[in-house]
Amino acid sequence: ITGTDLVAWQIAVAEGRPLPLVQDQIVAQGHAIEARLYAEDPAHDYLPATGVIHRFAVPARPGLRVDSGIVSGSVISPHYDPMLAKVIGTGASRDDAAAILADGLVRMTLHGPVNNRDSLVAILRSDAFLAGDTTTAFLDEQVHVLAPVASAEDGQRHAVAVAYALAASEAPVDAVPLAWSNVPAAPQFVTLQGRGGAGYTTVLVDRHRDGDRIRLASTDDVPYAQVFSIDAAELPGASARVEPAGDGVVVVVEVAGVAARCAVARYGDEVFVDDGLHSSAWTVEPRFADHSLDAAGHGPSTTVPGTITAVSVAPGDAVVAGQTLVMLEAMKMEHRILADVD
């Protein structure tokens, strides 16, 4: 940041006037970094996403600025660029600006389509970025930087928070809570799928007078009928309590000796969790298999509608995993749809 108006200077030069300052007179007064928040999936070749922005809120704090055309309720369509906002962090040093920007992104409430927020935070907090090692090859050379920001314990806390929030929202005793088993002799359970095609997590809660026993089980496939045969692992000393909070609920969850206040918001089958340090999104699986979906078949799909511009295979061709099947044009970009298996 130098306090100079470069646009005004360009106009002055175009009019034949001299520059008002020479290089030695320009003094840096701080640093600013801009991050572009996109509805795109870094884990799937940055494929753009569409959908409803259920909630968008940015915390006010010194040094943070947000330029955005979206509000809560906005729809991200396939007809335009998927950029959601430009977020700028300003500080006395480059490290300060990066820290302010990362903190603002983390504390932002963004309930909607898959986006690149976690990747931006990981980059801003990486040693390579803070050291200034930022060429155009950064993402290719620093692939490890884009590893998940949240830990396994964070994911466990969020899954437990979702389970307790769902139970609280379906409180009537004489009703069957959506996605919950209410058999008195059996533990209550709910199955959740993490965002981005992640595996399934089943949270099982045994209710006791002296406290709940919380267990977790992870699978690659939805464990409908076999849920009780899963070797669910108990979370020793885990506890949770629900507190009302505006439109949603706050669940205070303790796992591995670390407690977190998890704000949980639900929109249909989508559930979002924010704890002030990490965010996650989940899909609530129905209690029983939807056979109409099973009959629909399986195969490669895309999260965004578009126009098929090229077909790379023909009926009867043998394909291998990772092979391009079709090219799809959407949001001013071309996307390859790949085979999932051989």
Where are these regions (language model features)?
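Structured functional modules or segments
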Residues: 291-342
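Short strand-coil-strand connectors
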Residues: 193-199, 217-220, 231, 256-258, ...
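SH3/SH3-like beta-barrel fold
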Residues: 213-217, 253, 272-274, 337
